[in-house]
Amino acid sequence: AYRKPPFNGSIF
């Protein structure tokens, strides 16, 4: 997670 995505723990 770069900038707190909708899915916690995912890279978007």
Curated annotation (Swiss-Prot):
Domain of life: Eukaryota
Keywords attached to this entry: Amidation, Neuropeptide, Secreted
Secretion signal span: none
Record-listed Phenylalanine amide modification sites: F12
Subcellular location(s) of the protein: Secreted
Annotated GO CC locations: extracellular region
Primary localization class, coarse: secreted
Biological process, per Gene Ontology: neuropeptide signaling pathway
UniProt note on tissues of expression: Expressed in the CNS and midgut but not in the ring gland, thoracic perisymapthetic organs (tPSO) or abdominal perisymapthetic organs (aPSO) (at protein level).
Family: Belongs to the FARP (FMRFamide related peptide) family.
Record's protein name: SIFamide-related peptide
Source organism: Delia radicum
Organism placement in taxonomy: Eukaryota, Metazoa, Ecdysozoa, Arthropoda, Hexapoda
